[in-house]
Amino acid sequence: MLSAENNELVCRVGRGTPMGDLMRQYWIPALPSDEFPTPDCPPKRMMLLGERLVMFRDSQGRMGALEEFCPHRGASLYFGRNEEGGLRCAYHGWKFDITGKCLDTPTEQPERREKFCANIKARAYPCHEVNHMVWVYLGPRDAPPPFPAFEINTLPPDHVAHPRIMMEEANWLQNMEGDLDSAHLDWVHRRLHEDSPKPEKGIRGFWNPTGRPPVLDVVPTDYGAYYSAKRMLKDGNEWHRVNQFIFPFHTMITVGDGTVNLRSFVPLDDDHAMLISHAGHPARPLSNSEVMEQYGDLFQQVGGFIERTNDPRTYFMTKANKRNDYGRDMKLQSELMFVGIPFVGNLQDRAMTELMTNDAGEAMYDRTKEHLSASDAMIVTVRRQLINAAAKLRDEGTVPPNVDNVELDRVRCASLRYPPNADWKALSETARRVIPGQPSAAEVGLII
């Protein structure tokens, strides 16, 4: 349970809000590289933390992100021409490069254009492109902080799969909290029987070998927190799923196949967030065809994505969504799965979180109404960390350690088997570190 004040603080992400200002200290993943296939290709609208942007790849292949509205009289730069090293506004022809520098103001007389341009600048945000993803820095520093050193960002490009993205119609926090809550695996993601076959749509549901709920042990860190969700195996050993939270909105959730991953819950505004799932293999190339062979084209199994509009909040929106009960199939529910929503990406989770609203109808739950339990220990810890970090930035100007010390981001999740009462923290220390060239620790799969 949170106070109304702290709930507002931790959820709102617009410019000038404590949490929004905290997130702006970090590089933020925005759109996949293949949204911008060639130099001078058409620009794309984007929204991050409530700010409307236009992103484009210039003539040299460099990525840029500008405030959508031209500093002349506010026309949308989205309609501009991307050519010859910059984006030219369709309204009056003013032109800007990726740094926001004004290159031309053709409505001014030729003899005064150079001097006039020197006093005009579009609001521009630095971009960094790595491993099929474009990241943007929205923060206040003239020189951005170091780029995040997540393992997924440092692998060779052919070891990293194309990011899988799903739009979520709820506040970023209630979306992300599903990754901090291991107990829900035993319910919304479970199959009905241990030997239940894989459904026609989605992946096979989760199975808890003994049926006992997990016991959580949470460890706060300088970069966020990690936790073990301990379940008992039939042979009497303990199964520890060790997952990560990294400031400001990233998680790592073990899947037990030797790959490494990063899940980023990126707020577009207070009611919409993208779940960007990055996956790679430390030891060998990982092709997109291999990913499709392993997981299937899951989004297509539930109809694919809706047709995009001019609103970025429609990007990566599955056709199965809250307007059609997420493709709920009662035959699936009666025969194979505890819930009749296909286990595709975060579709089942979205059915739980997107309908959590406050009295104003926003998809931002009123957490004063909650009744938390021991299984919510990681959620409680991370909320406290986020609130404290946002308050320290607001009141003291202190940024979290991993803004500048990006080596703190060099962590992994793991799925491990230990004898009863083992010291899981000590035993998992190596598994939780990035060891270049070695697969992630997966002594126990996800049992799906």
Regions found by a protein language model. Give the residues of each.
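Histidine-centered divalent metal-coordination motifs
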Residues: 72, 92, 184
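Short cysteine/histidine-rich zinc-coordinating motifs and their immediately flanking basic loops
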Residues: 81-86, 100-104
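N-terminal pre-ligand scaffold of iron-sulfur
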Residues: 1-83, 113-139, 143
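C-terminal catalytic domain of Rieske-type non-heme iron oxygenases
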Residues: 37-38, 62, 135, 141-448
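Beta-strand residues in well-ordered beta-sheet regions across diverse protein folds
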Residues: 56, 66, 90, 105, ...
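Cys/His/Pro-rich metal-binding microdomains
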Residues: 71, 87-90, 103, 128
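Hydrophobic or amphipathic alpha-helical targeting/insertion segments
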Residues: 91-102, 125
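Glycine-rich loop(s) and the adjacent beta-strand/alpha-helix scaffold that form part
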Residues: 100-117
